[in-house]
Amino acid sequence: MLVRQPSFSLSAHDELYDILIPKDNFLRQMKELVDFSFIEEELKDKYCLDNGRNAEPPVRMFKYLLLKQIYNLSDADLVERSRYDLSFKYFLDLAPEDSVIHSSSLTKFRKLRLQDKDLMDLLVEKTVALALEHGVLKSNTIIVDATHTTSRFQAKTAKEYVQEKSKLLRKTVYKYQASIKEKFPSKPTTGSLEDELAYTNAIIDVIEKEEQLEQLPAVKEKINMVKEIIDDIEEEANYGGDPDARKGYKSTDYSFLGYKTHIAMADERIITAAVVTSGEKSDTKYLKKLVETSEKNGMMVDTVIGDTAYSSKDNLKYMKESEKKLISRLHPIITNGKRERGKEFEFNKDANMYVCPAGHLAIKKLVKKRKDSSKNPQLKYFFDVEKCKVCPLRDGCYKEGAKTKSYSVSIKSSEHLAQEAFQETEEFKRLAKERYKIEAKNSELKHRHGYEKANSSGLFGMKIQGAATIFVTNM
């Protein structure tokens, strides 16, 4: 049953908070700045309102998740720290003497209460509203980009991942007590996941019997992290790693297995919209959603800055129709074509035809329309194939036995022509220099907030991680 969380405590020990938690403490500042009651309103349909045992207040459970994300803790370590860290208890609206939840409650909260909830939009909307209310957000410009997060398992199987974490646990233990190696069971040789899990559990049992060793913070953290991974794996039937992670590419020679977060950020470095997808999704298709979500959240957008991925024909049309400026350079293939240097066909303006590298003039031309309406039509120029057969430059140009030889050139759309002219203006060049800000934000997300790697498997878990991370980053 849903119980409303009291907004104040009647404990005789509350004055400890004023003495020990400074005014500039991050958790104190967040608690005083944000009214988290919107979480209860959003999740109340997931609770029975008048029957059953009293549930832990949803606002407090959500705050536990924020703490987990801020401090990169396992569920068990989070609960343990919440017992004695007064800044945690203050943030959670607990009295100093109050007890804390069991770590299993966090798993239930994630799976039972947060399913079917768009936590990302809810939290981003809240932080944007706060920024507007406090006069932090004043610009009408957003910068768009996508940042990648590797899967928790990357390209490893669940067995390989357990082996890796088990090895890290053993290495940590050996630093304090190398002789314990004699007490560990033999490593499994069958190659099965079940045997690897049994072996790792046996190692944990041995360590936990050594009380002085088990209580060391470095060892305890590793044990709790391995236990959480094992629990995740055992809960999944037919577990096979991360089912939603997909391969994406950062360059031709660098791929990753995981997820993408498509981000819109205001000029003041407040994230105004975000969408989490699997790793293979194209950046191009999310510009419209990022703009519309930013506006729904309270932004007045008139300029969008992005890299070449966003200058597609559809995006240019959308920006023109919505009377917004797109600061995104056209891909070089559109502006310059994609022919190799030294193999270019040159246009003869007098003959209104192309001339091949051997100096032969095209004999006719046709307009070729594309089946995909988002692609520009082409002009196809035809050459005298009899000349091609005996041409000294035919290797790599004319295919032996072909009945025709043609050269195609895409006709630039009116959108591309307008953007090509716009990107040469001083205004475009000045605004394009602001794109570095979102690269810096991506770096902050990854290196300061642990967004480089997913901390759970599945798209649902990634969305929760993304929502909590961006909420904290915006604060």
Language-model regions: role of each:
Residues 1-34, 394-417:
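Charged, often Cys/His-bearing segments associated with DNA-binding zinc-finger transcription factors
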Residues 58-69, 84-88, 261-262, 289-292:
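Contiguous, well-ordered alpha-helical segments that form the cores/surfaces of helical PPI scaffolds
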Residues 74-77, 82, 98-99, 107-475:
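Anion-binding and metal-coordination hotspots
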Residues 26-66, 70:
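Basic, short loop/linker segments at the boundary and entry of helix-turn-helix/winged-helix-like folds
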Residues 49-56, 65-74, 94-97, 111-118:
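Short coil/turn segments at secondary-structure boundaries
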Residues 87-105:
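Short, positively charged loop/turn segments that connect secondary-structure elements
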Residues 62-65, 104-108:
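Positions in alpha-helical segments
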